[in-house]
């Protein structure tokens, strides 16, 4: 299950433009200290969560489906997603799943 939403490329230029406009307005009002505003921090956190949410998955759903399509149900239950705590990656177990 994917928890994080990745922004589409069409949304990024608009967001960058807003940040640029906000930065220019801050400069006009005489605020010399330019730290990350609350909006900037929030956006920064969101984009990085979206990025790392996808990197945590070791196998894509499509690949898991393709690998386990012709296997027994017991093998399908023990796919790499459920063995994260004890094993790292798909290729460590070769006895039950030959196609990993």
UniProtKB/Swiss-Prot annotation:
It comes from the Eukaryota. Residues 8-18 have a biased composition (Basic and acidic residues). Residues 1-45 are annotated as: Disordered. The modification Phosphoserine is found at residues 8, 10, 37. GO terms for molecular function: DNA binding. The keyword Chloroplast does not apply. Coiled coil: none annotated. Belongs to the protamine P2 family. This is Protamine-2. It comes from Alouatta seniculus.
């Amino acid at each position: 299950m994917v928890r994080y939403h990745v922004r589409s490329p069409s949304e990024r230029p608009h967001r960058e433009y807003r940040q640029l406009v906000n930065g220019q307005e801050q400069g006009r009002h005489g605020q010399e200290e330019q730290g990350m505003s609350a909006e900037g921090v929030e956006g920064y956190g969101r984009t990085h969560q979206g990025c790392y949410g996808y990197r945590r998955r070791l196998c894509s759903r499509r690949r898991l489906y393709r690998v386990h399509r012709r296997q027994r149900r017991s093998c399908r239950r023990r796919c790499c997603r459920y063995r994260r705590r004890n094993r790292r990656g798909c290729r460590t177990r070769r006895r039950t799943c030959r196609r990993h």
